[in-house]
Design a protein with these regions (language model features):
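A membrane-topology feature that recognizes alpha-helical transmembrane segments
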Residues: 1-309
Length: 309
């Protein structure tokens, strides 16, 4: 058992467990959209098309999808590639977390794994439903100060926690205060952005689910980290948004050519803007929070200080 928990083996052991956790997260995301279902009910997984109850080997992450040739064994319906994708992504982030956490800090690692898994779940639900579950956002706001109390190392690199601590080590009380300040900054800045957007454009710039998600994230990464997470999320959202607009522009132009329509590029671009403007912001915030959680020290700090010259 001790050999499995060694620094060289722990990331790979975590990745294997991450595959199975990813399989469970697939169930959570799928059942969130179905009234009357929950992660624990019904107890057995089944094909959403024919209701076939899956055998134990049909639940093996990734491998079962390959063996079944991505089809249900009973009805032959195609099993979406997002299922093995989510399993692999979960395994990857568990591997990264285990690689980043200092050796022997198992409680800190548990917090990291829980937060990263919740962020991944929130991202997939937001992509499907354009909403972020309160169980993740509000639950995160409840859990964050408790985690800060139990694991003060969570805010080891938060300036508020260091300012309130006497020595080099962050105290539990200072860590809890840093968690609350991070939540206030994370939620407050998005509320301000939303109100400014409402005044400038006559509509909310983002949903309240994003506000709660960033507030929850701030509880784990502190006030400075939450600002960097918002910056990273905004950059990735801008890149993806531009790519999405270009994709719709190409689709509109392609359909015009196929139907022998003569429509100007300007009109096609306006159509693409309407069709491609709706993108969930939650996955980008989640990515920013995850990057800060894992790479705030030393990579993002060095990058930020280097950018300031």
């Amino acid at each position: 058992m001790n050999s499995l928990l060694e620094a060289t083996n722990l990331p790979w052991v975590s990745a294997i467990f991450g595959l199975f956790v990813g399989s469970f997260l697939c169930v959570v995301v799928h059942r969130y959209q179905i009234p009357g279902q929950s992660p624990s009910y019904p107890r057995r997984s089944s094909c959403p098309e024919c209701g076939h109850h899956l055998s134990w080997w049909e639940n093996i992450p990734v491998l079962s999808w390959i063996v079944l040739r991505r089809r249900c064994r009973a009805c032959g319906v195609v099993i979406p590639a997002r299922y093995p994708l989510m399993e692999l992504v979960t395994a990857f982030i568990w591997w990264m977390a285990a690689s980043r956490v200092p050796e022997g800090e198992f409680l800190l690692l548990a917090v990291y794994l829980l937060v990263l898994s919740a962020l991944l779940t929130a991202s997939f639900v937001d992509l499907d439903c354009f909403e972020i579950p309160d169980s993740i956002s509000i639950g995160g706001m409840v859990l964050a100060p408790l985690a800060a109390l139990a694991v003060p190392e969570l805010h080891e690199h938060t300036w508020v926690a260091h300012w309130l601590s006497d020595g080099l080590e962050v105290t539990r009380g200072a860590s809890v205060v840093a968690s609350f300040v991070g939540m206030a900054v994370g939620g407050g800045i998005l509320i301000m952005v939303s109100r400014l957007g409402a005044r400038a454009f006559g509509q909310d710039a983002m949903g309240f689910g994003d506000v709660k998600l960033l507030a929850a994230g701030g509880g784990f990464i502190g006030p400075g980290g939450v600002l960097v997470a918002l910056l990273l999320g905004s950059v990735t959202a801008s890149v993806v948004g531009i790519a999405n607009l270009l994709r719709f522009f190409c689709i509109v132009r392609g359909r015009d050519r196929a139907r022998a329509r003569k429509r100007s590029a300007g009109r096609a671009w306006r159509t693409a803007r309407v069709a491609g403007q709706y993108l969930p912001f939650g996955p980008h915030l989640a990515l920013g929070i995850a990057l800060v959680l894992l790479y705030w020290e030393p990579y993002l700090v060095d990058w930020f200080l280097g950018a300031r010259g």
